[in-house]
């Protein structure tokens, strides 16, 4: 199963896509099919799996890391610093996904009926959000 998650800067999961049964899918393709309606003033901090989001959705504020150029050219100091700042913002969503995967029903093979997967992942997302809200 593959879902995409969005989280705010506190780590609360604010959006989750429905699962796809068709096997391997690229993150950006799932994003284009299930794009959340984010306000125009909200920045989307994404990883390199979403190359093309700035071109396809110019009205949306999005932040991608800078990709290393072809050949043996290293990034400049400014580009490395930008990527470091981007990673500090991005780690919040990675930690949210990690919290989800602590529940074995999400991280391992789903052994129930597939039609129940979205409900189960919604429940786990709610539990993760509940724990975060009670620890703040």
Map each language-model feature to its residues:
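Short, well-ordered secondary-structure "scaffold" segments embedded in the functional core
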Residues: 1-136
């Amino acid at each position: 199963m593959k879902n995409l998650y969005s989280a705010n800067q506190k780590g609360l999961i604010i959006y989750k896509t429905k699962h796809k049964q068709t096997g391997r899918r690229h993150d950006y393709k799932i994003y284009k099919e299930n794009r959340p309606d984010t306000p125009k003033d909200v920045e989307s901090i994404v990883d390199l799996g979403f190359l093309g989001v700035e071109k396809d959705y110019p009205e949306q504020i999005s932040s991608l890391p800078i990709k290393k150029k072809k050949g043996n050219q290293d990034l400049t100091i400014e580009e490395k610093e930008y990527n470091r700042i981007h990673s500090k913002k991005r780690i919040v969503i990675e930690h949210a996904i990690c919290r989800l995967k602590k529940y074995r029903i999400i991280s391992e093979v789903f052994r129930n009926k597939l039609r129940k997967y979205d409900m189960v992942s919604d429940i786990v997302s709610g539990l993760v959000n509940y724990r975060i809200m009670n620890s703040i």
